[in-house]
Amino acid sequence: LEEMKTIQNVNFKNTKALIRVDFNVPLNAQFEVADATRIVSAKPTILKVLEDGGSCILMSHLGRPTAQESEFSLRHIVSTLEAILGVQVLFSINCVGDEAQKASENLQPGQVLLLENLRYHAEETKGDVGFAEALSKLGDFYINDAFGTAHRAHASTTIIAQFFQENKCFGNLLAQEIESIDKVMQTGEKPVLAILGGAKVSSKITIIDNILDKVDHLIIGGGMTFTFVKAQGGHVGDSICEDDKMELALEILEKAKAKNVQIHIPVDVLAADDFSNDANTQIVDVRAIPENWQGLDCGPKSKAIFHDVVQQCKTILWNGPLGVIEMETFSSGTIALGDSIAEATKNGAFSLVGGGDSVAAVKQFGFEKKVSYVSTGGGAMLESLEGKILPGIAAISK
């Protein structure tokens, strides 16, 4: 992405910027915003347009409505959005049609208009061209700032871009996401380390395949560990294991060897006699887990080895926890890894955390400010790591 079109190179004076944001935020029982991270992330893009003397028309989805259920209305987020932006936010009860059109026409420079949930219309997720065109009429410049949906070819994220010949670009957040992934996958300072945790080998296979060409070290942790251990003849007791993926695990080890990538798998684990926070536990060799016991976190030797690997590396990608972090007893491996990454980052390494569970872990244990970048897009991040060209990104680059 040598010449990325970003908002920094555009002056939005007297421009109506139609911005696809990702305001798919969790709401509590009172329909108040429970976690405003995604709204805060969109702020720089919105403020840049307003400061230039333009106006903003914001479009987003919220949840997966099947009809126009009021619980999925974006009206619920208006007060939070106003507090974060520090400006009044106008609201349109539909995202297309006369009302939206009128609201957009009356918009003055410096004003912000939020459109109702895009997914109230089935055409959004179908990538309907007519719907995309109707949305495109609301603004004269299109900005995509929604990394969380960049891997979907939806009307507002991809199809709409064709109606803006030159007048389209990436927002701040999306540009940062692309640059961070680029740093790991292409331009990062070596040695490059990827840490993949989580339960299933099957969900990470394509990623592992793609990144073996880009990394020098690969740490495999979490539930995936046991498929690799058992494939090499170890005894994993009752630990989670995908027997049908053992061949694949051996192939990965072979490939890594051929490409000179060092793979690090836990050597010891904290095993439990039950899947519960109050289970009896013992530290055992990863290849000799007793019958009826299961490994639920990595052990002290593994933590020390992983710490050393992390300190050697200059570019670090972390995706997925190393243990069952939902239970305090089995969260220390993940916390230790977070500490190691924080230390390496302080010493000048670039660290990117992304993809579902690891983002939750980083927040839960307070590492958010101690790593270089936390990606907001779960699926989108994973698909980029798999080497896929995301449709939302391709549409702007055209």
Residues covered by each model-derived region:
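Active-site loop-to-helix "anion-binding N-cap" substructures in soluble metabolic enzymes
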Residues: 1-398
